Amino acid sequence: MAPRWLASLTAAPFTFSVALGAVPPAFALVPYAYVPQSTELEAAGLGIAQAASRLLRLGQAEDAARLAALTVQLLPADPRGWVLLAEAQLRSNQSKKASASLARAKQLDPRNAGIWFAEGSLALRDGQPQQAVGLLEQGLRLDGRNAGAHFDLGNAQLLLDNPQGALQAFERASGLRKGFWEAINNQGLVLYELGRRGEAIDRWRQALQINAKAAEPMLALAVALAATPPGQSEARQLASEALAIEPNYVLDAYQKEQLWGPRLRASAKTLLSHPDLKAAVDRANANASGSMETEEEPST
């Protein structure tokens, strides 16, 4: 149900009908201003927060941030408003403001695991994986069953060149959330770099069983299959389809952004240089933008 919006937090001044001469000219009329009760302010703040949440779901992050800022003005002691504001600021590329909002939320509710997770994700996005690990682990001590936090922790561990820690985190993530193909895919990324090619192939096939159109496990599987003659025909078919879905994967820099290790990237370069893939590679190069926004968001 849509929240009811208050037309105004202050009523218009009352209109007085005063006969001429009824009031001595020395006395000015003082208009009456309605001061809303705290319960009304709270209702207004929560209604605005709901509207901001809807705007976030619609992808209107900047408008959501403006409404969320009004929410925290009305409800400065409610950590939920600060978390909402931080999320809107983060999605509208206001990282520093988002960090400040999360810090305020944590002051108000230090045992809220979600706030620690959000700070960890922000640190990861800002290229601070070591800080992200500390924040995420603290949050997981409060709520150890958050699959997304384990996934972020795995990504941070990968960036810190800790493949075993990353693999463990990704396995926990997929164990906690059914159908979490992104976590299964990333297990494959780790296993391939560790030289466990067969296990990596199994993971990527599992990921494609969940999401048959996911470009990342499709191309990674193609790369792994191309290592032996029996798999080369399937590999070229999968690679062509993957590049049609997500052309950015033709770029080595984009693969690196998606946490592909050096072994997988080198193997991908070999596969994509095959003459049978020239047309697919040329199309991908023409359409590639290098932007991470076009790929499935959780896979980084």
Residue ranges and their predicted role:
Residues V30-P36, L238-T300:
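Terminal, low-structured helical/coil segments at or just beyond the last alpha-helical repeat
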Residues A44-G45, P79-R80, A113-G114, A147-G148, ...:
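Helix-start (N-cap) detector for alpha-helical repeat units in TPR-like alpha-solenoids
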Residues S53, E87, S121, N155, ...:
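Residue-level recognition of tetratricopeptide repeat
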